Amino acid sequence: MAISRLAGAARAAAPVSPGVAVGGSISVVIPARDEADRISPLLEQIVGAPGVAEVIVVDDQSADTTAAIAVAAGASVIAGEPLPAGWAGKAWALQQGIEAASSEWIVTLDADARPDPRLATAVVARADRDDFDFLTVGGRFECPTPATRWLHASMLTTLVYRFGPPGSATTPDRTMANGQCMTLRRDRFLASGGMSIVAGEVVEDIALARRLANDGWSVGFLDAADLLTIRMFESLGDAWTGWGRSLALPGVEPTSRQVFDLAVVLVAQALPLPRLLLGRGDLLDVVLLANRLGTLVGTRTAYDRADAAYWLSPLADLGSVSAIARGITRRGRQTWRGRTYG
């Protein structure tokens, strides 16, 4: 199962590259809650970028200077309304921003995104060329410490083992997405309910992609590492807590499939190396380890640097398995930036 998903990398769709602008203007929507420490690099690159008619920052009731920074950078700022019952914060912020936008095309970006100024026109051109109704793209990760890179690379690999790389063909109920950069046509999206169809989802990007795919939309998830860098986490602890919270895809994957995928990751990704090191491995473990190392070679372009910490990331695989297991078994409410969900 895992090997067949990895083999899909050879058949994956081509990455997004800079494209000629298509007809119709582009609005960039950025949901932001207490992002004063990291939103400036994004705004420096995207305000005034080619093809971008407006940049809308939805200030989701921040307690810091997010709004002032956005105004100073030339963005339009919307003061987010109080969170309605049944909504998660990001989905609500995106809904407000998309409703306020005036362009045919919407590109959403998270505050931790570091885009090439050509990104917006590139993703819109690709969506238009390939007739995607909804397109998300993955970027290149910037991990500021070796420890963060070590764990993050292992966690990313669990997604490749479970779902294949960006651009892989898949079924609607296994569709993947990256909510850090989404592209869609405003009017059709709002006519279909907008973010309200995933209002209460914590993993709203994948839930949205799967809902739209099941409704007959053409949904794409492609690589755009040459045009987008993401700085998600500042430390190993941040990665463990932040990504560990959603790595099991709570609310998106049924428990039975979560457990099955966990078993695939454990057997095919995490166990072969320790089994061989302990002298208990066999030929199958050798084959699986070779696949693991091949995957490591394949994902190196997803990181801003591939140093010793990156190449040693298979040693973190058992930790990544435990993060998925913890996500499957976690019960109760979760807190994020002063809000409690669940």
PLM regions: where:
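Short, acidic, metal-binding catalytic loop of nucleotide-sugar glycosyltransferases
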Residues: 44-53
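Cell-envelope/extracellular polymer assembly enzymes that use nucleotide-activated donors
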Residues: 25-27, 54
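Active-site beta-to-alpha loop of glycosyltransferases that engages the nucleotide-sugar donor
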Residues: 23, 30-44, 61
